[in-house]
């Protein structure tokens, strides 16, 4: 299935293991997800050129609008033949890539996310979701980033901050688990909204009564190898808080500004 040009519609995978080719496509939605992947499906998204998917909304909304929703038990493989190919994904009340959150009460768990050989920009404009990962009280499966360039922009307000990659929260409770994140041979730029959250890992708030420690937390079993993580505070930040370089064994060297 190949999509190109501009359109206002969602792509819903009913079953099976399809390959979706995004060839210089611009797909927007006002509700639901630009691409919806069910449990049991392994869906491959082949990226060609410069592509944008998801919501154009910039305000809070009462229905989730996501870029790519992959249900628990499902797998999405986002790939291309090189990092000159770009996918830009936007979500509100939903991760740009991952889970979604409905009416402040209902969370949908996310499955596994594999990003390889591609450049991805992921944005969420609501702190109930990480840019890549979980939304609300939902969980997310394993996030693999391999031979890729990723920019992940978490959201927030003056009291709360979501990580670029990781978990989120709802109005009832803090999530006590984060996705397993495995990064190799990649360049990751992660933007937290303010200093309360992790860069990768947990959401946080001004009370400090959360699991966030302002760190790169890849979860139990996660790792970073042969990769560089650029850490920013503020969605418009142009200067890093720190740059952490990981060698082939996962040993970090941190350079702070």
Q: What is the predicted role of each segment?
A:
Residues 1-257:
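A composition-driven surface/loop motif
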């Amino acid at each position: 299935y190949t999509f190109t040009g501009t359109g206002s519609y969602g792509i819903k995978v009913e079953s099976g293991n399809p390959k979706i080719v995004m060839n210089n496509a611009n797909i927007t939605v006002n509700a639901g997800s630009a691409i919806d992947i069910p449990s049991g499906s392994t869906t491959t998204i082949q990226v060609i050129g410069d592509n944008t998917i998801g919501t154009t909304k910039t305000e809070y909304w009462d229905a989730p609008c996501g870029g790519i929703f992959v249900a628990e038990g499902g797998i999405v493989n986002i790939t291309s033949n090189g990092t000159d190919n770009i996918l830009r994904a936007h979500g509100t009340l939903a991760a740009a890539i991952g889970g979604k959150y409905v009416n402040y009460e209902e969370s949908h768990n996310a499955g596994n996310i594999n990003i390889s050989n591609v450049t991805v920009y992921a944005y969420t404009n609501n702190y109930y979701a990480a840019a890549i990962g979980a939304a609300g009280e939902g969980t997310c499966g394993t996030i693999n980033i391999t031979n890729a360039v990723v920019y992940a922009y978490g959201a927030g307000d003056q009291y709360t901050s979501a990580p670029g990659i990781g978990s989120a929260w709802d109005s009832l409770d803090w999530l006590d688990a984060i996705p397993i994140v495995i990064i190799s041979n990649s360049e990751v730029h992660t933007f937290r909204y303010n200093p309360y959250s992790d860069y990768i890992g947990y959401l946080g708030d001004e009370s400090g009564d959360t699991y966030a420690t302002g760190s790169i937390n890849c979860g139990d079993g996660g790792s970073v190898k042969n990769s560089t993580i650029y850490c920013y505070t503020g969605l418009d930040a142009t200067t890093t808080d720190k740059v952490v370089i990981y060698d082939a064994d996962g040993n970090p060297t941190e350079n702070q500004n």
